Amino acid sequence: MAVTAWYEAQLTVLHVFSASLPLIPADALAAAPELADPIEPDKMLDEVRRFCVPSLSTLTRPAEFLVKDGNVPHEIVAEAKQLAVDLIVMGTHARKGIQRLLLGSVAERVLRTAHLPVLAVPPAERTAPITYERILCPIEFHESEPRALEYVLSMVLPFMKGVSPRSKKPGARLILLHVVENLFEQLPEYFSVHEREAMERLKRAVPADARDWCRPEPRVTAGRADTEILRVAAELGSDLIVMAVHGKGAINRRLYRSTTSRVIRGATCPVLTLCAE
């Protein structure tokens, strides 16, 4: 809601369900016949409205509500394309067991096919107003990342604490993280050179005018990408992780998206993914 309110954007709330009857044992149906009742979209739409209304008080434009029957990731992407949306927001409410794996599967399929920014939001651990004081932005030095970083700055910085579209105040931290693979970590002389070069590139990544908005902090670590991203995010108490999903080849895309999926599943703060292709 914070993003929608700041930009006075149109919010569309989408709920996807499957009307097909699952395989339920006959004795279970006999004990709970309501399981066989057909789903009524109008009633479900009313339920969605009632569920969401308490969270919509900050909106300047009335929200639109949609209920669709079908495959969850397919319907999400199809509606996003139909409505020409700028951002998809998904809640990662399932934190354990099979539900967590299923949620990861849905999120990964949306990331793979949406080709637009996706914000994955975990269960709320605080009720205070949302501010972005510490943003973690992993950088892989891909040729498309300057555009992704520009997008991050234009979209996220207006929501940082003490910053508004009309009043820029410095203070928020933008942590630029580059993770060096384990191979270099095991070769100290190579890691030292790579670390030095990476630090210089990170320092040059943020445009000069953006430094009036935030405090860029370059950081280089060694290890597996998703593990290091989650570790640094937890260490800093990050309010947001921003990742570019890129790679020209199919293998590169799969590798980076698998990293992104693991970060989404393990993060305790929202994760914004940007399609930088």
Q: Can you name each region flagged by the protein language model?
A:
Residues M1-P33, E133-V193, A208-R211, R215-R219, ...:
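Small/aliphatic-rich secondary-structure junction motif
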Residues A2-E8, T12, S18-L21, A36-I39, ...:
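Structural beta-alpha unit
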Residues W6, V77-A128, R231-E277:
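Gly/Ser-rich helix-loop-strand patches that form or flank binding pockets
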Residues A28-A32, Q82-L83, V106-A107, L136-P138, ...:
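Short, hinge-like loop/turn segments at secondary-structure boundaries
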